[in-house]
């Protein structure tokens, strides 16, 4: 399932610098780094940030990765500081989806791409209940569409995309 998301993400020109919101323990971070991108990995979990700094220390030393403790709703970047903003399988954890999407738009010059799990993925790709994922997906899609995002829905995941230029 995550392989499908990774393949889908490869089709996007993310530019050179990417803020990754909800980086967790770095699965997507590593893929972005392997694409030759500079990544600012954001998470609210101090353990995840510590892990990223340690596990990817060579990228940190090379200036290709910054791992920053911050909420999705308040990103510590200037307007348009990164080319793109990406989030994979984190949106269902974010309390204020509207604020998070607006923040990703604010810091990205070109593109915002957000992936998350559908209710059908419950128990298959993640430990969440179908009810929980359905509720969060409905909220996220309604907010995103009101903000001008495009929705693509697959069986186990969905994508919200907004191009800025």
What are these model-derived regions, one by one?
Residues 86:
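A conserved beta-strand element that flanks and buttresses the S-adenosyl-L-methionine
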Residues 94-103:
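A short, conserved alpha-helix within the catalytic core of class I
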Residues 109-118:
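Conserved beta-strand signature within the Rossmann-like core of class I S-adenosyl-L-methionine
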Residues 1-15:
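Conserved alpha-helix/loop element of class I SAM-dependent methyltransferases that forms part
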Residues 89-90:
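Short catalytic micro-motifs in class I SAM-dependent methyltransferases
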Residues 20:
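Class I SAM-dependent methyltransferase core
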Residues 125-144:
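Conserved Class I S-adenosyl-L-methionine
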Residues 25-74:
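Class I SAM-dependent methyltransferase SAM/SAH-binding core
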């Amino acid at each position: 399932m995550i392989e499908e998301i990774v393949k889908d993400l490869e089709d996007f020109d993310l530019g050179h610098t990417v803020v990754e919101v909800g980086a967790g323990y770095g699965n997507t971070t590593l893929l972005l780094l392997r694409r030759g991108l500079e990544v600012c990995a954001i998470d609210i979990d101090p353990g995840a940030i510590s892990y990223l700094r340690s596990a990817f220390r060579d990228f940190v030393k090379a200036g290709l990765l910054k791992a920053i403790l911050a909420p999705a709703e308040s990103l510590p970047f200037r307007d348009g500081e990164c080319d793109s903003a990406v989030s994979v399988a984190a949106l269902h954890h974010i309390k204020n989806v509207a604020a998070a999407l607006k923040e990703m738009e604010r810091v990205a010059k070109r593109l915002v791409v957000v992936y998350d799990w559908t209710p059908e993925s419950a128990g298959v790709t993640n430990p969440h209940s179908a009810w929980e994922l359905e509720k969060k997906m409905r909220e996220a899609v309604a907010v995103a569409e009101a903000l001008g995002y495009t929705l693509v829905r697959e069986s186990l995941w969905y994508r919200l995309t907004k191009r800025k230029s």
